A protein has these predicted regions:
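Short, surface-exposed amphipathic charged segments that create phosphate/polyanion-binding patches used
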Residues: 205-210, 251-264
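Structural alpha-beta junctions
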Residues: 234-243
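TOPRIM metal-binding catalytic domain and adjacent DNA-binding surface shared by DnaG-type primases
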Residues: 1-24, 28-35, 46-135, 156-157, ...
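Short, acidic/turn-prone active-site loops that include or flank metal/cofactor-
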Residues: 194-199, 220-221, 245-248
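Extracytoplasmic/secreted cell-surface and envelope-processing proteins
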Residues: 225-227
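Phosphate-handling DNA/RNA-contact segment within nucleic-acid enzymes
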Residues: 69, 118-214, 229
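Acidic glycine-/aspartate-rich tracts in secreted/extracellular proteins
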Residues: 38-40
Length: 281
């Protein structure tokens, strides 16, 4: 995180979306980068939108920034090899991965597939974010005790996906690393975006590179999740369908923890009609 900004937290949630994770606030309290609510000024990192806070009356609206300040807050982008070395230094023993997954109600094999590791110094899990070629472009952390989420300094947006992905024509797209792990635990060919509105171009490139013909987008059961799923579907040149967990279930991980089986997932997904790409409508 650049020194001019700090991560939101449960004590200081995002003033725009009111969530305790993913977003950042400038240290002077004048601006916020929200990763869920759009403004007319996308963050240069490609992840989130900038909102002028002022006295709180303009949160969620577009803003005009001082260009010199805006440019000065962009952290440098290290080569992906640096992230690879950093991540490799963390504990990736199978027993550790099994324990981390168990603590979240997930299958250890899914954490092994995603190469989830443990950073003892920060007491957090490390989830690598990858570009469509599989190179690590950043690291997402999740604190073991508090669940707080943040990214390694200099990280660029990427996808949560297995090091050795399946070669199938159908792809399941989720939101976040633990939802991706839940989908992988069911034996699905899955990748995850870092948030409900990010990663559209990354998914599009991945679909092209892997020759994917159909995508099932699993949306979080909230307005931002469903809006983001529809925007992603509209941007992809393949057949798509959007699956929302049943009422009372927040997301894919919650659904899996409540006993979802592969048969039940397939039945729920197959009840939804495939939608043609927008360019063919």
């Amino acid at each position: 995180m650049n020194s001019n900004w700090h991560n939101v937290s449960r004590r200081e949630p995002c003033p725009v979306c009111h969530k305790p994770d993913w977003c950042t606030i400038s240290n002077d309290g004048a601006m916020c980068v929200c990763r869920r609510v759009e403004s007319d000024r996308p963050a240069r990192s490609g992840v989130g939108w900038i909102h002028r806070l002022g006295n709180g009356s303009t949160a969620g609206m577009g803003c005009v920034l001082n260009p010199s300040f805006y440019n000065s807050t962009i952290p440098p982008f290290p080569h992906s090899h640096n992230f690879t070395l950093l991540h490799a230094a963390f504990d990736g023993h199978p027993d550790m991965q099994e324990g981390l997954a168990f603590g979240l109600g997930l299958d250890g094999a899914s954490f092994a597939a995603l190469d989830v590791r443990y950073d003892a110094a920060k007491e957090c899990m490390s989830f690598p974010m990858r570009n469509p070629q599989g190179e690590i472009t950043g690291l997402r952390y999740r604190h073991l005790a508090t669940g707080r989420k943040w990214s390694e300094k200099g990280s660029r947006d990427g996808l949560f996906m297995p090091r050795e992905p399946e070669r199938t024509e159908h792809l399941v797209i989720t939101e976040g690393p633990t939802d991706t792990a839940a989908a992988l635990s069911l034996g699905l060919n899955a990748v995850g975006r870092s948030s409900c509105l990010s990663g559209v171009s990354l998914i599009r490139d991945l679909v092209h590179a892997r020759q994917i013909r159909r995508v099932t987008i699993v949306a979080d059961h909230d307005r931002p999740g469903m809006d983001g799923a529809h925007r992603l579907a509209a941007a992809l040149p393949v057949l798509s369908r959007i699956l929302v967990p049943p009422e009372g279930i927040k997301d894919m991980r919650d659904w899996y923890r409540q006993g979802l089986t592969r048969t039940q997932f397939d039945e729920a997904a197959n009840a939804i009609r495939w939608q043609l790409p927008h360019r063919l409508l």
